[in-house]
Amino acid sequence: MNLRVALMLFLAVIMPIVRADEQSDKLKKAIAQELLKALLEDDDDEDKPKKPKAPAAPAPDAPVAAPAKKKGKEPTVAPKAPEPAPDAPFAFEAYQATPGAIYPSLVLATATIKDDGKEDDPRDATNYGDRMGILGVTLKNVRKDDKFVIEISADAVIRPSKLTFVAKASELLVTAAPKVKFDYEALGRITQTRPLNVTFKVTRNGQALDEVDEVLSLRQINDCPFALLTPTPKKNGKIVKEFHDIRFMFAAYVNENHPQIDQILKEAKATGVTKSFLGYQAGEKEVFEQVNAIWLALQRRGITYSSITNTTPVQGVNAQHVRFLDESISMTQANCVDGSVLMASVLKKIEIKACLVVVPGHCYLAFYSKEPEKGGKLYAVETTMLGSKAPLLDAINVATSQAPYSLQKNAAKFDQEDSGYMLVDLDAARDLGIMPIPYVKGLK
């Protein structure tokens, strides 16, 4: 089955070149303000962002590799699907969009995404029920007018869920997915991976068939899947593994509504770099001052770089452990993704447009100096430098123009398919329905 949310990719932007003066080792308030002013004055008109284009998809550093693209135009209409032989026995199997596992982060982040109504690939097996379903069944040798009842239940986090339908045609394979009734609050509290017993039951033409019981891996909420190799049933009776790039999932860990953001803003204001947080209501200089104040406040929190990213492997799924904002603050540790979602959460709270820049093996932050539609330029920030006490402008220079993975040095790659370079626009993610994973008080 296609994981339809994997098709909802975000805009990629050719990044502007940033030039800035060299910075002193110690950032003082007055010097910082002058340097920020100089940064704005040094920009050339030719550095305006180019027209957004479709983002690159699979990350080449991922163990799950995207299949090579075939040259030539793909057929838009599939040949007539073969029908099962008269004596072909009916059978069914359980399936999961993330094979062998359930990722609470994926369930919570995509819970409010609406079906876009677009036609499926005509070569895919007919789907009944939830086209974005996480769990379902594959039905083999279906006859026209067969009446089905599909039921899914589990020993935790899933309430009994049911789908009833009548087959529209005779087909070798079809998929069926009830709208699963997840216990979202319980999913948000899963802090350690555990086994989950899930029962799949099919009734055909009034006859209850043998149930299928599967033990799935219920992942911890910090596990963020970003690439999938999903078995997809086809009308010709074959099941083909298809690659899905879902790096938009990192946007689910950006939580602009987190209750601890107000305290961070209070501490940022106490730095004296800015008097208020007005987002784009003020000028570009004030925008940089707001970002700088937040940077200083987080540095004073003593956050250091931590490279812990691994999760227990699941076949066909690439995932990374991502800390929530409160975890990075309380543990004073953050890796590249953690630091980026932390700063992005605060910037989005004060309505400064932020993005996550995902490159092979790394992630960093980007923000616009003013609204993009008003000519705002995109600047990158290397958030792993928080722990080094580096000035904000050093972090901007590294991520925007100096590092091998920087925006300037890889501008063309953000327009190339399969390059592994993607800009995850947080506003676009929210518009799509990618929700922040809710904060759970007292979660350990």
Q: Where are the model-predicted features located?
A:
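Bacterial N-terminal signal peptides
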Residues: 6-14
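A ubiquitous, low-specificity "background" feature that marks scattered single residues
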Residues: 8, 50-53, 67, 344, ...
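A structural boundary/capping signal
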Residues: 71-444
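Positively charged n-region of N-terminal signal peptides that target proteins for export
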Residues: 1-5
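Sec/Tat signal peptide C-region and signal peptidase I cleavage site
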Residues: 16-20
